[in-house]
Regions:
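Stable alpha-helical elements in mature extracytoplasmic
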Residues: 20, 24-28, 53-57, 72-76, ...
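Conserved small/polar residues in nucleotide/adenosyl-binding loops
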Residues: 198-200
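Short, low-complexity disordered leader/linker segments with a strong preference
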Residues: 1-9, 33-37
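Structural motif
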Residues: 41-63, 173-187
Length: 200
């Protein structure tokens, strides 16, 4: 709850400009402005796709003594979690908090000063969709970025779901934009269906 007339400063760290991330940030700003009209100022920073910039941005927020940090994307969340155990942190556009924060025995609650929302889709539904749309498919290529922990996590989960349906899977990992085209071609050559699990 907010004290009548109190003002709050919120630092927003967004990994990269992207329509989905931009919408999440704007929705957060709109919701706080609606809940606390005229009481919140925002410092909205974009890391330009560089995870190291997230650390610099968040450390700046900590030095300024912001009241809340909103971390938009996994790199922003991990930077915020490393920077402070005191300032409340809200994450958004995070697929798997347990993976992002390297938590053993994650039960769905981070605890401490961290909370937020997840964008994790139901992976069993994705497996169901593949068998519904491509009933003759025998092999599925799982395309993902090896540098993104959320993608790796989802690959493992969806591979299990597809194996339970008797479908063979093979992982095709790329490291960055330099090898994505060749890896994607290899995946297409191997499989009846290519499932891309790429995150920001």
């Amino acid at each position: 709850s907010s004290a009548e007339g109190a003002t709050y400063k919120v630092g927003i760290c967004q990994l990269v400009q992207h329509p989905a991330l931009d919408a999440a940030t704007q929705g957060f700003i709109d919701a706080l402005n609606e809940a606390l009209p005229g009481q919140v100022t925002f410092e909205n920073k974009n890391a330009s796709g560089e995870a190291n910039n997230c650390g610099t941005i968040v450390n700046g927020f900590v030095s300024e003594g912001v009241d809340l940090i909103m971390a938009n994307a996994t790199a922003a969340l991990t930077a915020a979690a490393s920077a402070t155990a005191d300032i409340p942190i809200l994450g958004t556009s995070i697929t798997a908090y347990g993976v992002a924060l390297d938590l053993d025995d994650f039960d769905g609650t981070v605890g401490g000063n961290i909370s937020g929302t997840s964008d994790l889709a139901d992976l069993s539904q994705q497996a169901d969709m593949i068998t519904e749309w491509f009933p003759e498919a025998k092999k599925v290529a799982l395309l993902f970025c090896s540098a993104e922990p959320n993608s790796s996590y989802q690959i493992q989960e969806v591979a299990t779901c597809l194996a339970n349906k008797g479908i063979e899977t093979k992982e095709f990992a790329f490291t960055d934009s330099n090898d994505v085209a060749s890896v994607t071609q290899s995946a297409a050559d191997y499989a009846d269906v290519v499932l891309s699990l790429i995150h920001i």
